[in-house]
Amino acid sequence: MQEQYRPDMIEPKVQQYWVENKVFKAIKDESKEKYYCLSMFPYPSGRLHMGHVRNYTIGDVISRYQRMLGKNVLQPFGWDAFGLPAEGAAIKNKTAPAKWTYENIAYMKKQLQLLGFGFDWDREIATCKPEYYKWEQWFFTELYKKGLVYKKTSTVNWCPNDETVLANEQVHEGCCWRCDTPVEQKEIPQWFIKITDYAEQLLGGLDTLPQWPDMVKTMQRNWIGRSEGVEITFDVANTNEKVAVYTTRPDTFYGVSYLGIAAAHPLASLAAQNNPELAAFIQEAKNAKVAEADLATMEKKGMATGLFAIHPLTGEKLPIWVANFVLMHYGTGAVMAVPAHDQRDFEFAQKYSLPIKQVIAPLADEEIDLTKQAFVEHGKLVNSAEFDGKDFDGAFNGIADKLEKLGVGKRQVNYRLRDWGVSRQRYWGAPIPMLTLENGDVVPAPMEDLPIILPEDVVMDGVKSPIKADPNWAKTTLNGTPALKETDTFDTFMESSWYYARYTCPQYQNGMLDAEEANYWLPVDQYIGGIEHATMHLLYFRFFHKLLRDAGFVTSEEPADKLLCQGMVLADAFYYTSPTNERIWVSPTQVTLERDEKGRIIKATDPEGRELVHSGMTKMSKSKNNGIDPQEMVEKYGADTVRLFMMFASPAEMTLEWQESGVEGAKRFLGRVWNLVYQYQQNPAKTSLDITALSAEQKVLRREVHKTIAKVSDDIGRRQTFNTAIAAVMELMNKLTKAPLDSEQDRAVMAEALSAVVRMLYPITPHICFELWQALGNESAIDTAEWVKADEAAMVEDEKLIVVQVNGKVRGKVTVAADADEDTVKTIAFADENVKKFIDNQHIVKVIYVVGKLLNVVVKP
C-alpha cells in the first residue's frame, strides 16, 4: 500500500470493482434471510443535494452492515420521475419534460455512483417509463371494477399558478405546498380512490408498527381522524327541506342556539335565490382559500339565511347561518353550534349577538365565566331536561338513544380522512386509463390498450397541457366505436405508492407483480425518508399495500416494518441588501469568515469585500443559496470523508449542521486510520494471537477492542445511533495509535484490532476499508467479510486498576484482582511505596472505597 491516503486514487478503482463484479446484485435465495433496505427515491431535479446524500448514506450503511451479518440484502434505486417541476423547466429551457428528466437522471446517477452507494442498478426504475405506469393504469381499472374508484364533480383545492388540483395534504396554511401560491376553491370533475373504505384498517395497522416513529403514527392517526358521534337531522321550518349535522358532543344538544352551513351547502343556494346580499356573501366565501388548519385562527364571518331549523327535542326555532368556518367537504357541510361549549361557536355568537346557553357545568364546583370564553371540557348536564346531572357518557348514550327512537338521529363513526383525489390537470404524469363513449358512458380502457402512452416529444407553451391542447390525442376507439381518452393525469403520489413493490420484480412483464418475488422480499425491512411525508406518501404507501394484498399480490399487512425519518441538513446562510432593498444571498463557499475564540462568526465578507449578514443555520435551499454541492465535496475530500461526516455530525433523526471544518476533521481521522495500517504493515505480525501469553497491558488493549465491537454492533444494529458508533471507533483509534508494536504479541493484538476497526468502519467508509482490508493480508474482498464479533471472554476483566487518594489527592494506582474485596484492596494500596509516604505516622480517620474504582484514605496527624 502507498504511504499517503489518496481517496482520488482509491475510490474510482473500488467503484469499478463493484460495478464489474455486480457485488450488490440481489437474487432471491430462500436459504438466506432476506433484508430489504429502501431509501425514498428522489425526484430527478438535476443535481443531488446534501439531503439526498444523507438519506442514501444512512440506507447504505444499514445495507452494508446487514450484508456483513450474512443476510441477502436488496437495496434498489430509481426515480420518481413525473411531476410539475419538469414542466416548468421545460418551458424555461425550451425543451420537453421527458428530455429534461432523462438528462437529469443520467447526471444524478453519475453523482450517486461517485458516492459509492451499494445499489442494485439492475433494478433501476423510472416512473415515467410506460413499462412502469402500464401496470399502475391496469391496477386503476381493476380498482374501478371493484367499485373503489369513482368520478364526481367536487369542490377542490385549485392552485391557479400551477393550474392543478391539490389534495388536502398539499395545502399548507392556505397555500400550495410546492409554489406557495394562495389556493382557491373550484368545482371540477375528479377521479377518486376510496381510501376511506380502508380508514379503519389504516388506523388499526398503526398499532402493528412498533418500529415506526411515534410522531409519524400520531400524525397519521390525527389525519385519519376517527371520531364517534351522532348524525342528527333537523327539519327546516316552513319548507320540506332537512339539514343533517354530525356531532361528537350530543351531550351539548340542548345548548344549540344556531346552525352553521357551508357556502356550498344546497340550503345556502336555496336561501340566496331571492337574497342578492346573501348570494354575494356566499360567492365571496366560496372564493376564500380555507384549509382546515386555518379554521381555528381565521376571522369568523357569517350571514343569516332567513331559514330556521326545528330542534328535534325542544321544538325551538334555530336560525341557520352561512358561516365561513364550515367546510362542505368535511362532515355534512353543516354544524350545530353550541356557543357555551365550543370556542369557535362562541366567537361567532358573540360577534353576531346570538344566544349562549349553558348546558354543561364543571364536575367540580369551579366558577366559569361564559361571557369571556366557552367551557369546552366534559362535565355534568344542566338545563337539559331529563338528562340533568348526567356525565358525558351517560348523556351521550341517553340523548343518542332518544334521537334514534324518534328517527332523527343515528350513532355514527366518522373520519376526517377524505377520499384520494388522483386527477391532475397537468401533462407530465401518467394518463388516467378511462374512456368516454359517444353516449357519455365512462368505461375503463381494456388491458390490450394499455399502456395509454404519454407522448414525450412535445412543446410546452406554459398554458395548457399538450395532450389537452392536441384535439387528436384523445381520439380513440373501443370495439370499433369512437371514444375519448381522459386527458387528466395521475397525481404523482400514485407512482410512489407502489414503487417499493415493483423493485422486487422490475423486469416482470406478465403482470403488475411477480407474487413469488414480492412475497420473498416484502415487507421492506428498513424504510428511510423525511418526516414531511408522514400524511401524504407514507399514508398512500400503506393504503396501496392493502390494495395489493386484497388483489392477491402480497401477503403482508404493512409495506415496511421499520421507518427511520432522517433530519434535514442545515448550512450557514449569508446575504447583503441591494440598493433596491432586496436580499442577495451569497453561497457559503464564497464567504470569508472571522470567528471569535469560541468559534462564533463575528464577521463575514463576500469576494467583493462586502460585509454580509449571517442569518444563521437554515435548511439548505436554492432560495437562500446555501446548498453545498456534494460533487464538489467528493472531489475535494473523497466520498468516504463526506459519508463519514454525514453519519458522525448528528444523530440520524436530528438536523445536521454542515460545517466544512467537521468534514476536514473526518478526512484527518481517515488519514490516521490509513497511517496506522501502513505503520503496522511495515512490520506485521508473523504469528497468530496467543491469548494465554498476553501481558496485562495487551489484555487491557484487547478488552477495549472487544468492548468497542460490542458497542458499535449495538449502536448500528439495534439503536441506529451511528454517530456514537463512530465516536467509539475514534476513541479506540486514540488508544491504538499509542499502543506499542515492539513484541510479536503486540503486533498480533494490533492485527486483531485493525481487522476489527476496518470492518466496523466498512459500512460507513467502504472504499478506504476495501483497500485496508487487502493491505491487512485478506485474500477475499471485504464486501464478503463477516461482521466482527465481540469476544465475551476478552471483555471480562480479571484485574482492576484502583486509584488511591489520600485526603482527596491522587497518590497512587494499584492493580488488584477483579473480585478483590475491600480488605485486600486496602492491604495492597497501603503497601504501595508512594501511598505509604502519605499515610505513615498519620492517624487514619476513615477509608472510603468505591468498588472497583477508587480508594480514598482520610488521615490527620
Swiss-Prot record:
HAMAP family in the record: Leu_tRNA_synth_B
Name used for this protein in its record: Leucine--tRNA ligase
A GO biological process held by the record: leucyl-tRNA aminoacylation
Cross-referenced NCBIfam families: leuS_bact (TIGR00396)
Annotated compartments: Cytoplasm
Keywords carried by this UniProt record: Aminoacyl-tRNA synthetase, ATP-binding, Cytoplasm, Ligase, Nucleotide-binding, Protein biosynthesis
GO CC list: cytosol
UniProt entry tagged with the keyword Nucleotide-binding: yes
Motif ('KMSKS' region): 619-623
Signal peptide: none
Lineage of producing organism: Bacteria, Pseudomonadati, Pseudomonadota, Gammaproteobacteria, Pasteurellales
Pfam family, one: tRNA-synt_1
Motif ('HIGH' region): 42-52
Recorded name of the encoding gene: leuS
Residues that coordinate or bind ATP: 622
Family per record: Belongs to the class-I aminoacyl-tRNA synthetase family.
Sample GO molecular function, one term: leucine-tRNA ligase activity
Enzyme Commission number(s) from the entry: 6.1.1.4
TM stretches of this protein: none
Gene3D superfamilies, sorted: 2.20.28.290, 3.10.20.590, HUPs (3.40.50.620), Isoleucyl-tRNA Synthetase, Domain 1 (1.10.730.10), Valyl/Leucyl/Isoleucyl-tRNA synthetase, editing domain (3.90.740.10)
Catalytic activity: tRNA(Leu) + L-leucine + ATP = L-leucyl-tRNA(Leu) + AMP + diphosphate
